[in-house]
């Protein structure tokens, strides 16, 4: 239902104007040349939700994120059950498996159609999409939110746009909840 824009569209697709249960649906993915129809089972999580839950499982009682656990266990194993996911986070997840790499040194290059790119060009929104649990676990502690989100972001992204975007999103979550409960 994420692509339905009005109740008429819901009625046409599902026979009902209000959705109260999960439905299996199909989505075209993969682009023009290598596209395919992905069957999304009722109740399935998106890649963003999967990684958000991975981050949540990595948070200690005191609000700190076990970044090594997230990187070497959650992120590395995510590839076995990932639903979708962008190129940036998938490559980072593959590269974090190297024994010589730590959560704070996941530096890599990768080939694309246009040449060779490196982690510093990884500026997508994958980091921002998973940081909600960090902000919620540290409400009211902006410095801790910034630090934990920065550390979590650099595991998969090297471009300042991705890192600062995730930090700004975490700050916004904190401020909205603190000042508009």
Map each language-model feature to its residues.
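Structured, active/binding-site neighborhoods that engage oxygen-rich ligands
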Residues: 1-181
């Amino acid at each position: 239902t994420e692509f339905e824009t009005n109740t008429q569209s819901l009625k046409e697709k599902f026979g009902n104007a209000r959705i109260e249960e999960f439905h299996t649906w199909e989505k075209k993915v993969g682009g023009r040349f290598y596209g395919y129809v992905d069957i999304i089972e009722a109740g399935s999580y998106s890649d963003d939700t999967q990684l958000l839950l991975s981050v949540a499982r990595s948070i200690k009682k005191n609000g700190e994120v076990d970044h090594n656990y997230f990187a070497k266990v959650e992120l590395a194993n995510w590839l076995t059950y990932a639903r979708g996911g962008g190129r940036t986070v998938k490559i980072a997840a593959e590269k974090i498996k190297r024994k010589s790499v730590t959560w704070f040194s996941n530096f890599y290059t990768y080939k694309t159609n246009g040449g060779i790119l490196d982690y510093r060009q990884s500026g997508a929104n994958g980091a921002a999409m998973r940081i909600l649990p960090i902000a919620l676990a540290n409400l009211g502690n902006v410095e801790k939110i910034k630090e934990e989100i920065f550390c979590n972001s650099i595991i998969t992204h090297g471009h300042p746009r991705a890192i600062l975007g995730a930090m700004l999103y975490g700050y916004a979550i904190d401020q909205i909840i603190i000042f508009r409960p």
